[in-house]
UniProtKB/Swiss-Prot annotation:
Catalyzes a salvage reaction resulting in the formation of AMP, that is energically less costly than de novo synthesis. It comes from the Bacteria. The lineage of its organism: Bacteria, Bacillati, Bacillota, Clostridia, Eubacteriales. Pathway: Purine metabolism; AMP biosynthesis via salvage pathway; AMP from adenine: step 1/1. This is Adenine phosphoribosyltransferase. It comes from Clostridium novyi (strain NT). GO terms for biological process: adenine salvage; AMP salvage; purine ribonucleoside salvage. One of its GO terms (molecular function) is adenine binding. GO terms for cellular component: cytoplasm. It catalyses: AMP + diphosphate = 5-phospho-alpha-D-ribose 1-diphosphate + adenine. Belongs to the purine/pyrimidine phosphoribosyltransferase family. The keyword Iron-sulfur does not apply.
Length: 172
């Protein structure tokens, strides 16, 4: 399946100069959604994944069914103040300013094999924060998987030496 054909591209959203990749068209197409989840599962099936981590919010959409298919646990990474128990945090830079992500302190056990699943790789800032927290808790990141990668932003290079997979690539 050509997933790129299933992703709606909206020019000038949310502001002029942005080419927005709308994944809702993948989510509401049952064949495209199944293909996406199955392709990520296929990439991860031999990695003995214990935990799938999904960053807020669209990482939840793909990470949860991937975890289910692998027989793994799912752990959400949330924005600051959204998790009820003790957390660890990581700050990352945005275009203007910064933001903070958090994960429950007891969500990842030392030595667990972790796959991170998200919708889009852009600059790599969010993913570096997620990786930092997982490794701080003792998890081993075995793969980082995306539906979309914006290759011109070089997020893959900024993430570094991890197994990184994306299903669709765009040069922006």
């Amino acid at each position: 399946m050509n997933l790129k054909e299933k992703i709606r591209v909206i020019e000038g959203f949310p502001k002029e100069g942005i080419s927005f990749k709308d994944i809702t068209t993948v989510l509401n197409d049952k064949e495209a959604l199944k293909y996406t989840v199955d392709a990520i599962v296929e990439h991860l099936k031999d990695k003995n994944v214990d935990v799938v981590v999904g960053p807020e919010a669209r990482g939840f959409l793909f990470g949860t069914p991937v975890a289910y298919a692998l027989g793994a646990a799912f752990v959400p990474v949330r924005k600051k103040g959204k998790l009820p128990c003790e957390t660890i945090s990581s700050e990352y830079d945005l275009e203007y300013g910064s933001d903070v992500l958090q994960i429950h302190k007891d969500a990842i056990k030392k030595g667990q094999k972790v796959a991170i699943v998200d919708d889009l790789l852009a600059t790599g800032g969010t993913m570096n924060s997620v990786i930092e927290m997982i490794e701080k808790l003792g998890g081993e990141v075995v793969s980082v998987d995306f539906l979309i990668e914006l290759t011109d932003l070089k997020g893959r290079e900024k993430i570094g030496n991890y197994d990184i997979m994306s299903l669709v690539q765009y040069d922006i």
